[in-house]
């Protein structure tokens, strides 16, 4: 049984959203079962399209040869990373109706905790 990894993303900033994807893709590439749970402004990472793609930091990161958010999102999908937008977080931030990327679930914290089980949780 592989060790599960849960990534709880509460920040809507580019740096934390980007690194949540770096951690998720890296862990999934190593065979770990990964779930990203985005809440509050962190839900913006899972929007379709994500406004983080237009953040000036995105171009700077890519210009330095680092994979950007679009590449990492695609990698996470390909690697089977589960993506959940927090229902309460969407409501709290006035984001109900935000178009989410295909395959993104809307669920609550209990669903996230159940998915991670006895695994690790990283909060960004």
Region annotations inferred by a language model:
Residues 34-40, 83-87:
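Short internal beta-strands
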